[in-house]
């Protein structure tokens, strides 16, 4: 307000010669001065001593809600670096301390395995490049690598735990780390011998509980399986596996068929227990009625007599009497389908049909 008064006084001095305009200017400045007191009062309210003298630390809860964020330069540098840890998206978690950029950029070297490292062939192909390289497997300290040597050029590799990652050589730039998960199953490596002949095939055997139960070595030329015990302490040699049973089943088929035929013959012999006891006769029957009819041949007994008037024929078997009785009645139940001729006996019809076949 002091500067405003000085400005008004200077204007009054410059406009002394102009009487009419001076009066108008005073009216304008008077209206401006009349409006100044509310503004002064408003400013006095804004700068009240209660607010100025208030202690800013009386409400510490307001400052606890304020989160201190790292500088934008440090956050910008984090986007250019590869992510080495999983992102935690849960709420109300204490923020982990940020690592310096030098520690994040430092290469991570996996621990070297104690034994001689096995190699895996990994082929990576893109739209304009296809490369293949021998990449050493990286085993964690908890992993167990056991290998068993067998005759020939086979090597069985057992990986108990999983392989977390495979580190690529420095020569192959532009390729990232590939996570590899290997199941706990035996892997079989078979190579051809120097002479180029077919090598033996090693087939792993998995028991019903999912554990390794040994392996079977199969020769492609002879297909004769040979069991090889596994290096696992809990594994046992089981010949009841599916692969071995299928091969053994093929070899045992002729013996099984012969055994079945022998059982059938024994069954027939047991059933044919009715044997003729006359001297010089070795007839055997499965039914006692047939044996009785046969014995009548030796004894001459004829119990079946024809009941037709004036006929005195007798027979040892009932079927013979039936055929004889058809002569009296004239019934011929057996008819030829080709010429419609009828016969009283089935054997006569069979002889007649042979004539049609030979014609």
From Swiss-Prot:
Sumoylation at Lys-67 represses transcriptional activity and reduces cell cycle progression into the G(1) phase. Has no effect on subcellular location. GO terms for molecular function: DNA-binding transcription factor activity, RNA polymerase II-specific; DNA-binding transcription repressor activity, RNA polymerase II-specific; RNA polymerase II cis-regulatory region sequence-specific DNA binding; zinc ion binding. It is found in: Nucleus. It comes from the Eukaryota. Keywords: DNA-binding, Isopeptide bond, Metal-binding, Nucleus, Repeat, Repressor, Transcription, Transcription regulation, Ubl conjugation, Zinc, Zinc-finger. Residues 216-235 are annotated as: Disordered. One of its GO terms (biological process) is regulation of transcription by RNA polymerase II. Pfam families: zf-C2H2. GO terms for cellular component: aggresome; chromatin; cytosol; nucleoplasm. The 9aaTAD motif is a transactivation domain present in a large number of yeast and animal transcription factors. In KLF8, the motif is inactive. Interacts with corepressor CtBP2. Interacts with PIAS1, PIAS2, and PIAS4; the interaction with each ligase sumoylates KLF8. Belongs to the Sp1 C2H2-type zinc-finger protein family. Transcriptional repressor and activator. Binds to CACCC-boxes promoter elements. Also binds the GT-box of cyclin D1 promoter and mediates cell cycle progression at G(1) phase as a downstream target of focal adhesion kinase (FAK). This is Krueppel-like factor 8. It comes from Homo sapiens. The lineage of its organism: Eukaryota, Metazoa, Chordata, Craniata, Vertebrata. The gene is KLF8.
